[in-house]
Amino acid sequence: MSFLILVRHGQSIWNLEKRFTGWVDVDLTDQGKIEAEKAGLLIKNQNINIDFYYSSFQVRANHTLKIIQKVLKSKKDFVRAWQLNERHYGELTGLNKIETAKKIGEDKVFEFRRSWDIKPGKLSRESSYHPLNIETYEKIPKELIPDTESLKDTYNRVLEYFKNEIQPKLINKNILITAHGNSIRALCKYLFNLDNNQITSLEIPTGNPLIINFGENLKINECKYLDLSLIHISEPT
């Protein structure tokens, strides 16, 4: 038996400001830190020993994990993987969602955010928001760094890493991942065999641990959120 715990980072500064965040590094708000601490307490109450910790390259997910580990009194190192990053929102990066909807229409914004294979225009490689101009990504091959992504692109990126690096470690081991709305959405599509329509409408709340219990041959026995009050209130960034 093994457990996989998925936690979307706590509320970030740009979540609060309703801006498209994507690969930009923004930290948690005070509320986000509280959410992360609460997530840690919920996980602690499950009495599960975590063998491996994973997070994305992004500060908000890393900070969430560090807070959780502090609550769990765990000093284990965690793996940072850029493949677990949020979806790259291209030229929408940094824009306010409400103002953008007024300019190009709510239907168009909804299409960009929730369609399976439609992506926004590319983010200029001259932009300070582009990963190529961020020191964190200087060791990542340039050809692997996106200018924009669809949810399908995000799914393919996340799943390749998960299947190669994380899933093999799940056999009789427990793993905790802190990541993002769309990268966790991608994992849920794979783990629960969701179709494209189901995955685009799936909401992932901030700071609410999703715990998946696997049995023999990694067959899912049970899946539940640890805080039912937080379901269906969050949106991807």
Range-by-range predicted roles:
Residues 4, 62, 70, 145, ...:
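Active-site-adjacent alpha-helix immediately C-terminal to a catalytic or transition-state-stabilizing loop
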Residues 9, 83, 180:
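Active-site glycine-centered loops adjacent to acidic/histidine catalytic or metal-binding residues
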Residues 11-26:
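Glycine-rich N-terminal loop/short-helix segment of MobA-like nucleotidyltransferase
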Residues 22-38:
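Short catalytic helix/loop segments, enriched in acidic residues and glycine
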Residues 29, 33, 54, 58, ...:
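Amphipathic, non-transmembrane alpha-helical scaffold segments
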Residues 39-131, 137-139, 189-211:
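Phosphate-coordination/substrate-recognition cap region in phosphate-metabolizing enzymes
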Residues 229-237:
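Residue-level detector of conserved catalytic or cofactor/ligand-binding positions
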